[in-house]
Amino acid sequence: MKKAVLLFIVLALLVPMVAFAAPQPLKIAFFVSDLSNVFHQAQFAEAQKYAKAKYGAEVFAFDGKSDSAVMTQNIDQVVAQGMDAATLHIWDQEAAKPGVNAALKKGIIMTSFFSPLADTGIPTARSDEAGTSFAMGAEMAKQWKKAFPNKPIVMVQVGWPNHTEVKSGRTDPFVKGVLSVDPKATNLGCQDSSKGPDVTKQIILDVVTQHPEVNLIYSEASNLTVGTMAALTQAGRGKFANGKPLTEIVCSVDFDEVEMKSVYDPNSSLKLSMGLPPLETGRGRIDLIMDIKSGKVKPTSQPAVEKFYKTYNISYWTMPRADAVKWLNTQFGTSLK
């Protein structure tokens, strides 16, 4: 009898402990295309810190290693590793669909970063690249017309002409920005530089040989800009004189410490770059997941919900170098002066 009473007391004490046990933290898979990239390192680090502080959630990096197949395989690991949610960065959307749909059926919250994921309808977090691309195009056109009012504008872009989001976020709005200043500007179009900086270098060499009149260049990623500027230098171009263009004006994407040296060099023709902020991006990707969890955003819809987050126009003319240094130090944790 005493044993039965003792057992009853023990059980009575245990039940409230079980009932009031702390809930398990939400586990979030945070996909990046390449964790060796400083932007992706910084946005993951911020997402991890932000999710823990604001939501008590745990964030885990899923590195795509710049390999489309690895990115797709990582989707299977979302289920295998018991994740509650995932924010995806995928290159092959069609290949990813089966894994995404399987995860959705298991009640896992799925979102995408940069591009809507095929017709899955999962919400997408995107950077507002179009606004900054337009601004850079307009500013470059104004500066060229100021320096050379009688020289017609001839522009070219190097990037990903067949990538929907790059076209809508970078190429097209840049062209519109230029045309808003000079409706008669000539556009040579977007050249396919998807194979990297070496191919980009040859493309630019060919362009300036065949069209020496080209004077506005949008190099649509910082790695491509390495090839762009190398080509211009080899061709005897890429020059400014104390802040005034001599041969052309170049803008880029993915502003970083390396690009800052050229942007604020009064004798380099690289004068603007789109700053993609890892802090706002990392936080935005987490907030989108939590908005789905709270019911503010539907898990799927047609068309997919798209949330846009701020980008920055880092410009020799409109952003003082001290502000650019502060931006880099804040966003990337550098200690520049």
Give residue ranges: language-model regions.
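Hinge/cleft segment of the Venus flytrap/periplasmic-binding protein
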Residues: 24-26, 158, 166, 276-337
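Extracytoplasmic "Venus flytrap"
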Residues: 26-46, 50-54, 59-77, 81-83, ...
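Short, solvent-exposed amphipathic alpha-helices that sit
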Residues: 39-53, 132-139, 165-185, 203, ...
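Short beta-strand elements in bilobed, periplasmic/extracellular small-molecule ligand-binding domains
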Residues: 53-64, 154-157, 175-197
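Short beta-strand elements at the ligand-binding edges of bilobed clamshell
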Residues: 63, 117-142, 157-159, 190, ...
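Hydrophobic alpha-helical segments within soluble ligand-binding/sensing domains
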Residues: 71, 125-153, 169, 200-201, ...
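Hydrophobic alpha-helical
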Residues: 76-79, 85-105, 174, 192-262
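Flexible loop/hinge segments that line or gate small-molecule binding clefts
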Residues: 93-131, 256-265
